[in-house]
């Protein structure tokens, strides 16, 4: 299933192309990944930073793994030799990768017009509550619920982006 295209991601999040071959072709994307260890061919890879990691360091693995699009905010992470080794790469530079991920999730949420969203908040028991709501709704409806304890900014965006356009519900942990 095509998630979006590289061009539609750029339209949703902004940014400028560091590499785009061929310049006017549509690159279909099958989903989103923030981890090269679980990246599947055709997914867009968002190079996020954390306290102890910088996913920009893993661009060679993302490109070798078949990322259909790479979203970065540090252009030095895509040096000329990496560009030469991956001539078909689509690399989008944005001011902030996390903000771009949030923008994409917000744009995608607007496309889920027929999907009811349920947000579960609180200090304890969110994941269990999400699982219970999903188990009940799944008996009669088609939907998506957060896969893990995705109750932070990144996890919420990934949960929204994992929904299918045909879903009747989306259960998020906030």
Cite the ranges covered by each PLM segment.
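N-terminal leader/targeting and accessory segments in enzymes
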Residues: 1-103, 107
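Phosphate-binding loop of NTP-binding sites
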Residues: 98-174
């Amino acid at each position: 299933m095509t998630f979006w295209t590289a061009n539609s991601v750029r339209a949703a999040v902004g940014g400028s192309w560091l590499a785009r071959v061929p310049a006017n072709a549509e690159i279909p994307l099958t989903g989103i990944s923030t981890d090269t260890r679980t990246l599947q061919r055709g997914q867009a890879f968002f190079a996020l930073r954390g306290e102890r990691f910088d996913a920009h360091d893993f661009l060679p693995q993302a490109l070798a793994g078949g990322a259909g699009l790479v979203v970065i905010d540090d252009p030095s992470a895509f040096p000329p030799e990496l560009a030469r080794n991956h001539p078909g790469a689509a690399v989008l530079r944005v001011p902030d990768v996390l903000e771009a991920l949030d923008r994409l999730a917000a744009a995608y949420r607007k496309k889920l017009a027929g999907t009811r969203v349920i947000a579960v908040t609180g200090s304890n028991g969110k994941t269990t509550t999400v699982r219970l709501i999903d188990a009940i709704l799944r008996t009669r409806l088609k939907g998506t619920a957060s896969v893990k304890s995705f109750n932070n900014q990144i996890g919420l965006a990934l949960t929204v982006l994992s929904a299918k356009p045909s879903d009747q519900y989306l259960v998020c942990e906030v």
